[in-house]
Amino acid sequence: MKIGIEAQRIFRHKKHGMDFVVLEEIKQLQKIDKRNEYFIFVKPGPDHCIKSSVNCHVIEVKCPSYPLWEQVALPRAAKRCGVELLHCTSNTAPMFCNIPLVLTLHDIIFLEPRGSHNKSLYQNLGRLYRRMVVPQIIEKCRRIITVSHFEEENINNKLCLPPGKVTMIYNGYNEWFSKRNYDANVIGRYIDAPDYFFFLGNTDPKKNTERTLLAYSQYLLKSKVKRRLLVADIKAAEVDAILKRYGMSYIREKIVVAGYIKNSDLPHIYSSAFAFLYTSLRESFGIPLLEAMACGTAVVTSNTSSMPEIAGSNAALVNPEDADSIAMMMLKLETDGDFRSSMIEQGLQRTRLFSWRNTAEQLLGVYASV
């Protein structure tokens, strides 16, 4: 069978969650499947992270905007290649496409109420696009894939889909993520010493950046050690604005804002952290949880949405809407060495349940059933 896979953004330099998911899936399919023929549709970019192989063809499709690329250029390219099944991997798909569709619907956050603060223009436009497209394509899709039981139940309840249309397939994590010895050359690009708290921030309200910074300020008031906080995926000006809004500018000297951290550096960043804070209000899966655990790092995460499902009892669970709950867990990890050690060991064991090979094998089952 000729299978097309939409992977529009994997050639861009700064990749994020869904980009890595489809990239890892493609890599595994290249390894394990020699029967089907694959056409990987990408937008041109600087990072040629996958190459064509005997039965896997990388097709660069040029188009200036995301909607036009997906709605016009992608179905045209798929038709030219004789694709018999098109897998769209990032929540949306062409509305007018005669090729049988499989859609990975990571979440339906775009159908839920907005956060308490406005998102960026880019985020708002993306939300509007998904709200317009998904209802139009959902019935046309032969199968919907999602990434956790939490999200599967959420999708079924809100979209009223027929039984069996949604298939849950867990994500994996890259085995590149493993415990690393301290490397001053790598760590020094971002922070000057190890044993910091590490937090992946964002302006998206679901990432809970404001409340996590509030929790850190409470931690500093009570801690004797007063570890620094390394914040990634957010601009310094945005952190400064939050601190100013809450009258916390005095803690700025303890916060290091790293911006975007290269994926190749992340194993070192996780490994040298005292703990990883993944305190989102809402996640559909949470690959960073597994990455941190695989690097031997204690994880503080939320007791909401998919995070307890993915972490199990192998992370320190907190109420993400309560800054005091987050702060107290940071302090507990600092003052209770046995507890922290148990979280590290249990986290390492938990990661053994997840792999991209398992994900790819289940994908093949979906393709064969359509």
Give residue spans per PLM region.
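Carbohydrate transferase catalytic cores enriched for Leloir-type hexosyltransferases
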Residues: 1-370
